[in-house]
């Protein structure tokens, strides 16, 4: 409410102008309806009675009207009455008492009443129809006119009716919204911050997958899905630290050299900033060593780790001779080989957690498990799980397993009617899956249904790169956008939901003291606008999202309700690991990492030393050729030799000094020869070394870089 004179003047002028304009329209409508009423009455009378009856009836009612004035009229009028071709002459008194004339008057009156009722009803209907048409036209003039783009609705049942009308509604629903039939093979993307509701959507889809008996591979980072869905009779778990872990066999899983290469590509990912030589060399050594061990009857994960990390570099060189990896451990570049093995340590150390799982029953391979899919009965699920405190250590192995499962889909053969689900919440918490970009577009031919949850599109770009991330995101057709707090990410989500093209209506008023100046002008301008603003994305409550379906269907604002699920199994059961073997492997890893740190220092640029005036004078003398022998003598005087490449002579400590740095009880090859001495040294110097080794960050220690580059791709999220 405002008592400001300006506001009251403006409001009064506009109200007065509206009243005048409404009065004009009302007068025109009533005038037209009045004329229309009598036209209708005349038409009904013409249809209902004859002309003779109409005329005679009118004469009767005219005489009735003049009856009270008959005594005042000196000369009584005579009326000619038509009666079926005959003419009779009657005065007013005769007309009023004639039975035929009375009958004609009754017929005329009844016909007139009927005609008036019919005309009134028609006029009322006409009035409302005209009012609705005029109101609709006025509303259209004042509303935006949509000319293209996508629409937005907050009622999922409207979209459900559209899908049902088109015959494309599916039995799979997210809340009240059905997805498009068979669109599950076109993949899902769940985008939003933590705790917004992505896992709830995955659970809704997982319920349908369990009811239909579909095969499912699910990445469970926290154990929540194991707790709610694990069925030990048909399901499998892959978690190196879980007692229920299947006895996965690397050498039965990988039958050919390319299989080992693919496994190494995921186990040892390429960094985004580091020199790819180090990771690529580590991949080659791991793949070749594992391939050579396939025919060893005593092969095991412990032996594989020992071969790669424990034995001397000379023995590793002998083991890899006549293989493509032999060039990477040659004696001429031994220092580089030691650095490559240090890189290998960061990722292969995750394999040590697999030691002992071969005793967990029959050998298990993901490839054979997926080939055993049955369409006539319910299929099992594969849970690839971890927990928060061990995820960083298990990430290479988990990424490797998931990559094998993704490739295993192609080995199942083409079948569009089959459904194999891959649920991966928080996908960027894994290493880059190299085959995902190529396999995802083709997976629909094999019945693959991928459901990926990400916190932001920036995570995909950080892990996979700009172009690969765009390719992945483009093949995820059904999308749900939950809350994104940051402006940039929320703006991206708003753009992906879509925009509409419309003619935006505008209305302007002009008024003045003279009514001639009063007027209203309307117009429309073309405009493109996003369906939702980034602020709408930022302010979404939990369990509320915008869902976009493939095809010409509106975007839907969907609200979900959390559904509690009973606990059917423990999320995690610790597995007993051989402590002696674990201690030995920990010691080996400690030795290799210490060796890697020493080698890393050799590849760092030297800091120039401040020299005295004498040295400056000597340095101004012309340089003379220096023989290698003289150079060795001068190496003790503090002159630094730059480490510019792998072919240069690098200053190394004597082997005796290296042995002195190893803990007591550790041999030169890194093996534990005196467990009691080593454990005593641990208790005295490093009481918490075991815990530190388990949780050590996976840092590339072989190239000099900034501290910020030590983070794995995706660890910032």
Swiss-Prot record:
Alphabetical list of InterPro entries matching this protein: P-loop_NTPase, T4SS-coupling_protein, T4SS_TraD, T4SS_TraD_DNA-bd, TraD_N
Membrane topology: Multi-pass membrane protein
PANTHER family in the record: CONJUGATIVE TRANSFER: DNA TRANSPORT
Periplasmic face of the membrane: 48-104
Cytoplasmic compartment spans: 1-27, 131-717
Effect in UniProt of substituting residue 715 to K: 10-fold decrease in conjugation efficiency
Main location: membrane
Disulfide bond entries: none
GO biological process: unidirectional conjugation
Species: Escherichia coli (strain K12)
Protein name (Swiss-Prot/TrEMBL): Coupling protein TraD
Protein location: Cell inner membrane
Binding residue positions for ATP: 192-199
Matches recorded under Gene3D superfamilies: Magnesium chelatase subunit I, C-Terminal domain (1.10.8.80), P-loop containing nucleotide triphosphate hydrolases (3.40.50.300)
Family (UniProt): Belongs to the TrwB coupling protein family.
Single GO MF descriptor: ATP binding
Listed GO CC annotations: plasma membrane
Protein's UniProt keywords contain Cell inner membrane: yes
Function, in words: Conjugative DNA transfer (CDT) is the unidirectional transfer of ssDNA plasmid from a donor to a recipient cell. It is the central mechanism by which antibiotic resistance and virulence factors are propagated in bacterial populations. Couples the transferosome to a type IV secretion system. Probably forms a pore through which single-stranded plasmid DNA is transferred to the secretion system. The last 37 residues are important for determining plasmid specificity and transfer efficiency, with additional specificity conferred by the TraD-TraM pair.
Positions of transmembrane segments: 28-47, 105-130
Keyword entries, A-Z: ATP-binding, Cell inner membrane, Cell membrane, Conjugation, Membrane, Nucleotide-binding, Plasmid, Transmembrane, Transmembrane helix
Ranges where the record places region Disordered: 614-639, 650-669
Pfam families xref list: TraD_N, TrwB_AAD_bind
Subunit-structure text: Interacts with relaxosome component TraM. May form a hexamer in the membrane.
């Amino acid at each position: 409410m405002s008592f400001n004179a300006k506001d009251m003047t403006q409001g009064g002028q506009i109200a007065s102008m509206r009243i005048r304009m409404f009065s004009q329209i009302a007068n025109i409508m009533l005038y037209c309806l009045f004329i229309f009423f009598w036209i209708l009455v005349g038409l009904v009378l013409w249809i209902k009675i004859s002309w003779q009856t109409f005329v005679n009836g009118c004469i009767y009612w005219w005489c009735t009207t003049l009856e009270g004035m008959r005594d005042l009229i000196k000369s009584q009028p005579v009326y000619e009455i038509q009666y079926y071709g005959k003419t009779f002459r009657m005065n007013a008194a005769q007309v009023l008492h004639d039975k035929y004339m009375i009958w004609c008057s009754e017929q005329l009156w009844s016909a007139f009443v009927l005609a008036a009722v019919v005309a009134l009803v028609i006029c009322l209907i006409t009035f409302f129809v005209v009012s609705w048409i005029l109101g609709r036209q006025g509303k259209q003039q004042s509303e935006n006119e949509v000319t293209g783009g996508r629409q937005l609705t907050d009622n999922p049942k409207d979209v459900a009716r559209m899908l049902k009308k088109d015959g494309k509604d599916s039995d799979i629903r997210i809340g009240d919204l059905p997805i498009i039939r068979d669109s599950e093979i076109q993949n899902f993307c769940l985008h939003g911050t933590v705790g917004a509701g992505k896992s709830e959507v995955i659970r809704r889809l997982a319920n349908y997958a369990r009811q239909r008996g579909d095969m499912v591979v699910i990445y469970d980072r926290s154990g929540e899905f194991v707790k709610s869905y694990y069925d030990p009779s048909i399901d499998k778990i892959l978690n190196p630290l879980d007692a229920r872990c299947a006895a996965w066999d690397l050498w039965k899983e990988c039958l050919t050299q390319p299989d080992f290469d693919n496994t190494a590509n995921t186990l040892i990912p390429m960094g985004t900033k580091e020199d790819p030589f180090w990771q690529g060399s580590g991949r080659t050594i791991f793949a070749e060593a594992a391939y050579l061990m396939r025919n060893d009857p005593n092969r095991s994960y412990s032996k594989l780790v020992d071969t790669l990390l424990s034995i001397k570099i000379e023995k590793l060189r002998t083991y890899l001779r006549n293989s493509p990896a032999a060039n990477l451990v040659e004696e001429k570049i031994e220092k580089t080989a030691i650095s490559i093995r240090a890189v290998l340590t960061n990722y292969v150390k995750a394999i040590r957690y697999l030691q002992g799982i071969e005793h967990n029953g029959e050998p298990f391979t993901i490839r054979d498990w997926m080939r055993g899919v049955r369409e006539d009965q319910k299929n099992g699920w594969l849970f690839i799980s971890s927990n928060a405190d061990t995820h960083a250590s298990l990430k290479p192995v988990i990424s490797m397993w998931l990559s094998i499962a993704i490739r295993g889909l192609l080995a199942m053969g083409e079948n569009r009617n089959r459904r194999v689900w891959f649920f991966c919440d928080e996908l960027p918490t894994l290493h880059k899956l190299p085959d995902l970009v190529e396999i995802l577009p083709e997976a629909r031919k094999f019945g693959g249904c991928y459901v990926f949850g990400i916190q932001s599109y920036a995570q995909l770009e950080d892990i996979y790169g700009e172009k690969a991330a765009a390719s992945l995101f483009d093949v995820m057709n059904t999308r749900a956008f939950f809350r994104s707090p940051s402006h940039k990410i929320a703006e991206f989500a708003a753009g992906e939901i879509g925009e509409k093209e419309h003619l935006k209506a505008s209305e302007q008023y002009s008024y003045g003291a003279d009514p001639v100046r009063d007027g209203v002008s309307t117009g429309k301008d073309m405009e493109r606008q996003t369906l939702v603003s980034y602020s709408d994305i930022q302010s979404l409550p939990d369990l509320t999202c915008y869902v976009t379906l493939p095809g010409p269907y509106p975007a839907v604002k969907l609200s979900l309700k959390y559904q509690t699920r009973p606990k059917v199994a423990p999320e995690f059961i610790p597995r007993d690991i051989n402590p002696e073997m674990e201690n030995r492997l920990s010691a080996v890893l400690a030795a290799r990492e210490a060796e890697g740190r020493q080698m890393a220092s050799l590849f760092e640029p030297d800091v120039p030393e401040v020299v005295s005036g004498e040295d400056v004078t000597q340095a101004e003398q012309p340089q003379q050729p220096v023989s290698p022998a003289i150079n060795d003598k001068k190496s003790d005087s503090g002159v630094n030799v730059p480490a510019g490449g792998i072919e240069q002579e690098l200053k190394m400590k004597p082997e005796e000094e290296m042995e002195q740095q190893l803990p007591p009880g550790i041999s030169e090859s890194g093996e534990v020869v005196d467990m009691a001495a080593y454990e005593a040294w641990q208790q005295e110097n490093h009481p918490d070394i075991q815990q530190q080794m388990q949780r050590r960050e996976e840092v590339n220690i072989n190239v000099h870089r900034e501290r910020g580059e030590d983070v794995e791709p995706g660890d910032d999220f």
